[in-house]
Amino acid sequence: MDSVTIAWAALMAISTFSLSLVVRGRSGL
């Protein structure tokens, strides 16, 4: 795999994880 592909995949994963955490936190509170 290319390093750029890995970096892009990691960025997408972190963004999705952060977004889900924010939504879950707001709905939870």
From Swiss-Prot:
Q: Which Pfam families match?
A: PetN
Tell me the GO BP annotations in alphabetical order.
cytochrome complex assembly; photosynthesis
The superkingdom listed in its UniProt entry is: Eukaryota
Classification of source organism:
Eukaryota, Viridiplantae, Streptophyta, Embryophyta, Tracheophyta
> Predominant location of this chain?
plastid
* Record keywords, A-Z: Chloroplast, Electron transport, Membrane, Photosynthesis, Plastid, Thylakoid, Transmembrane, Transmembrane helix, Transport
Question: What protein name applies here?
Answer: Cytochrome b6-f complex subunit 8
Is Hydrolase tagged as a keyword?
A: no
How does the UniProt record describe the way this protein sits in the membrane? Single-pass membrane protein
Which compartments is it annotated to reside in? Plastid, Chloroplast thylakoid membrane
MF term (GO), any: electron transporter, transferring electrons within cytochrome b6/f complex of photosystem II activity
The protein's gene is named petN
For whether the record's keyword set contains Electron transport, the answer is yes
- List the GO terms this entry assigns under cellular component, sorted alphabetically: chloroplast thylakoid membrane; cytochrome b6f complex
* Family in the record: Belongs to the PetN family.
General function of this protein: Component of the cytochrome b6-f complex, which mediates electron transfer between photosystem II (PSII) and photosystem I (PSI), cyclic electron flow around PSI, and state transitions.
> Could you list the residue ranges that cross the membrane?
3-23
Record text on subunit structure and interactions = The 4 large subunits of the cytochrome b6-f complex are cytochrome b6, subunit IV (17 kDa polypeptide, PetD), cytochrome f and the Rieske protein, while the 4 small subunits are PetG, PetL, PetM and PetN. The complex functions as a dimer.
